[in-house]
Structure formats: C-alpha cells, structure tokens
From Swiss-Prot:
Lineage, highest ranks first: Bacteria, Bacillati, Actinomycetota, Actinomycetes, Kitasatosporales
Gene Ontology biological process terms from the UniProt entry: D-xylose metabolic process
InterPro entries reported for this sequence: Xyl_isomerase-like_sf, Xyl_isomerase-like_TIM-brl, XylA_actinobac, Xylose_isomerase
HAMAP family associated with the record: Xylose_isom_A
Location within or outside the cell: Cytoplasm
Record protein name field: Xylose isomerase
Quaternary structure note: Homotetramer.
Binding site for Co(2+) 2: 217, 220, 255, 257
Organism superkingdom: Bacteria
A GO molecular function held by the record: magnesium ion binding
The keyword rRNA-binding is assigned to this record: no
Length: 388
C-alpha cells in the first residue's frame, strides 16, 4: 500500500492548524502568518482533499465589506486552482474579548444575539463555498465558579441558539447539518457539553434533532480520561457522527493537539480500524497544531505526517482483520456470540427457558477463559509490524 495520500482519502485540515503561529499563554508567536490561499495550495501539493475554516481564519475580525470580499476572492482562487474542497466550516465565538463569557450562553443577552447573527452570516458563506457540515465548538460556554452560571438556564439558551440556527438553515433550504464539538475544559474551567455523551443527550432535546450530530476530537475526549474509539462507536451507533477531528494526546492534561498518531498510538489504531470497518464516509479531518519549535518546513512535515500515519494504521488494521489467526481468535473470544440477540425469541420464550437461569451453571461459565489477551497481542503484533 502506498502511504502517499490522494484526494480520494478525504484528508482535510483546518486553516487554523497549519496557520497556527505558535503563540501560547507563555510565549509569543514563533512563525509568521500564512495566507489562507497559500495554505490551500501547499496542502493540495501534499495530497489533501480540502480545508475548513472559522470565519475569522479567512476574514479578519472587523473587516469591512470590501476587505471581506477581497479575502473571499483570494481564497476562492486558491480553491479553483487546486480543486480543493471546503467540506466544513465553523464560527469563532471564542477569540475576541466580547466572548469572554461565551457566545450562545453568555449572561449578557446582547452578546448572545450577536453570536447567533455572526454564526448565521458565516453559515451563508459556508454554503456558498460548498460546506456540507457546520461545526459548533462552544469553547467559552462554561464557567470557572459555581454561582457565575445557572447551568440549567444556560442550557436553555444553548438550545434556543441551536433551534434558531436550525430554523434558519431550514428556511433557506440549506442542506447543512450541524456537528457539536464537545470538550471538558480549556479555555473555560468547565465547558458545557463536555463529552460525546453529553452532546448526544442534548441533541435529543432540540426541535429538529435530525439536523444535529457530533464532531468529536481525539484529544478532547482523552482529556476527560475517556476511550475515544468507544465514544466514536456510540456516535456511529446513534447515527450522529457527522464529522470527526483527528489529532494526538498524551493522557489527561492540557489540549496538546499533537499530529495524528503520536500520543496514544493504540487508541489511534483502534480508531482507524473502527472508521474503516464501519464504512464512515466523511472527511478525515486533522485538528492539530504544528509545535512552536518548527519553522514552515516543519509545519508541512507535520501535516504530511498526519496523513501518512493514518494510511499506515489503515493498512495495519486491514491486515489485522484479514489475518486467519485473528479471525479464529475473534471466534475464540466469542465475538460471534455478542452479535447474537440475547433473547431472540423474546421475553415470553426467555422466562420459561430453564437453561437461562434455573439450570444455568454460573461456576462453569465463570471458569471459561475469554482468550482476550491472545487476541489483543495479535492486534499489537499487527500494529507494531511484527506480522505480515
């Protein structure tokens, strides 16, 4: 298998990823600004399928209408020259100080109204550029102190905002579903809708739940100590995996945004195995930050590494699934039994079946080994390249 990506692999990057200048809470920028059109061209050369953007990535906050038009024109030229797509867009409701207490859930009503209008304006541009999904990350929606935010009321306001956006895209005839991106903390001390499960439960209460799914990020779930492939499996099970952000994270700490692969390599393997075996058809979107130690050569090497690592893991996962010894080990671990309904004939057949309870020997069942370790070692052998 070739590890050279092509547009058919559907690898996409946010403009804010390769465009990150290396500025953090403890240090100034270590790289200059990148023109979005230049990012488009360089990513196309690497084999990417498309780019994504926040409104403020493409158009500086506060730009005049004429300046806005010029930025969009230059970006379009880059797309037209390269054939790159814009599968997703989102709104920056976190950088400007006006959003210090959030956008959709700010205590200040004027800020909430502005946040909804800012989002609507960028939805129009996203649709114009061909975006098929609109992501919403509420990085400032939360609190640092208990009395500062009535969470139940804040969730009312969050629901109201998403219902307004759903009403807007429906009224405009846009086929642009929303993907809510969970995160437990950072930049706020605690963020609303912190995990995939919280977001899925919230979506059920919206007026048009069919318009909303999730955009989980590797590092965000791992910051909460959760198993990311398990979370993705539940999102797929619910039919709500509308988009995904791929990166790397080493344990429960700040959001590292490593390139995809480093961090928890085993979790990355199981994630790729899941996405490919489940037939996920959406973009493989990288949301990472090239380390501030790197110059621009390092930026492009980091982006290329994201795609290469995915393709290597895809190859290893396919080999794992095709291995006859693995298939036998899966049967020994009773995965085929898990796929069988527990009571296929229903409750009325289960209740009188003495083999299910009265004649069941729990000690004998407890003595049966599950053979999980052998299966897991076969997976590790494939991941580490010890099997063909």
């Amino acid at each position: 298998m070739s590890y050279q990506p092509t547009p058919e692999d559907k690898f996409t990057f946010g403009l804010w990823t390769v465009g990150w200048q290396g500025r953090d809470p403890f240090g100034d920028a270590t790289r200059g600004a990148l023109d979005p059109a230049e990012s488009v061209r360089r990513l196309a050369e690497l084999g990417a399928h498309g780019v994504t953007f926040h409104d403020d990535d493409l158009i500086p906050f506060g730009a005049t209408d004429s300046e806005r038009a010029e930025h969009i024109k230059r970006f379009r030229q880059g797309l037209d020259e390269t054939g790159m797509k814009v599968p997703m867009a989102t709104t920056n409701l976190f950088t400007h100080p006006v959003f210090k207490d959030g956008g959709f859930t700010a205590n200040d009503r004027d800020v909430r109204r502005y946040a909804v209008r800012k989002t609507i304006r960028n939805i129009d541009l996203a649709v114009e550029l061909g975006a098929q999904t609109y992501v919403a990350w509420g990085g400032r929606e939360g609190a640092e102190s208990g009395a500062a935010k009535d969470v139940r009321v804040a969730l009312d306001r969050m629901k109201e905002a998403f219902d307004l956006l759903g009403e807007y895209v429906t009224s405009q005839g846009y086929d642009t579903p929303f993907a809510i991106e969970p995160k437990p903390n950072e930049p706020r001390g605690d963020i609303l809708l912190p995990t995939i499960g919280h977001a899925l439960a919230f979506i059920d209460g919206l007026e048009r739940p069919e318009l909303y799914g999730v955009n989980p990020e590797v590092g965000h779930e791992q910051m909460a100590g959760l198993n990311f492939p398990h979370g993705i499996a539940q999102a797929l099970w619910a039919g709500k995996l509308f988009h995904i952000d791929l990166n790397g994270q080493s344990g429960i700490k700040y959001d590292q945004d490593l390139r995809f692969g480093p961090g928890d390599l085993a979790a990355a393997f199981w994630l790729v195995d899941l996405l490919e075996s489940a037939g996920y058809e959406g973009p493989r979107h990288f949301d990472f930050k090239p380390p501030r130690t790197e110059d621009f050569d390092g930026v492009w090497a980091s982006a290329a590494g994201c795609m290469r690592n995915y393709l290597i893991l895809k190859e290893r996962a396919a080999a794992f699934r095709a291995d006859p010894e693995v298939q036998e080990a899966l049967r020994a671990a009773r995965l085929d039994e898990l796929a069988q309904p527990t009571a296929g004939d229903g409750l009325q057949a289960l209740l009188p079946d003495r083999s299910a309870f009265e004649d069941f020997d729990p000690d004998a069942a407890a003595a049966r080994g599950m053979a999980f370790e052998r299966l897991d070692q076969l997976a590790m052998d494939h991941l580490l390249g010890a099997r063909g």
